[in-house]
A protein has these predicted regions:
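Short, hydrophobic alpha-helical segments
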Residues: 168-172
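Cofactor-cradling patches in redox/metallo enzymes
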Residues: 1-167
């Protein structure tokens, strides 16, 4: 199957990522473009697992509203499809926090948890940390994070959730 023939396929279980040529140029059209990057992520994960001699793990944490919980499920599904195994944040190779800006308590918890992740990343420098959600759409928040929390690898808002596979591939 060629990637161009799969672009209408919405059931990820029916897509054979191993048949996608990740050495070709990524398709311009969505969702074929994201399938390409899911395949690329899977190959990256497999290679990293061979190097480490163990499975790569991930942790998804949601702060805030029910909409975030739904988005986090989608993100966790993409991580699983790429080959990550769910784990606690202490053991995770990739941690993603889905943030909320509406609930101030959630905002404060994110900043507190970032200090905790910073300590974990000192012990595991290969750990990747991502922040997403509506809090990441506020320019002043993003600037603060980029300046004061430079250990964070990926920051993206809700308008880029559909590009998560592409953004994830860029982290490695």
């Amino acid at each position: 199957e060629k990637l161009s023939e799969m672009h209408l396929e919405m059931d990820l279980d029916k897509i054979d990522l191993d048949k996608i040529d990740i050495h070709a140029e990524p398709p311009a059209q969505e969702p074929a473009r994201q399938y390409y990057f899911m395949a690329k992520c899977r190959r990256i994960v497999q290679k990293k697992e061979q190097e480490l001699g163990r499975r790569l793990t991930c942790h998804t944490e949601t702060f805030g509203c029910q909409m975030n919980a739904r988005d986090s499920e989608k993100l966790a599904g993409i991580l699983e499809f790429a080959g990550f195994l769910e784990a606690g944040s202490e053991e995770a190779d990739f941690v993603i926090y889905n943030t909320c800006t509406v609930r101030e308590n959630a905002n404060n918890r994110v900043y507190g948890r970032l200090g905790y992740l910073h300590n974990l990343k000192k012990k595991n420098p290969d750990m990747r940390i991502a922040l997403c959600g509506c809090m990441m759409q506020e320019e002043e928040v993003v600037e603060k994070l980029k300046k004061s929390y430079r250990f964070v690898n990926l920051i993206f808002g809700t308008h880029n959730l559909y590009k998560f596979a592409e953004l994830l591939a860029g982290c490695y």
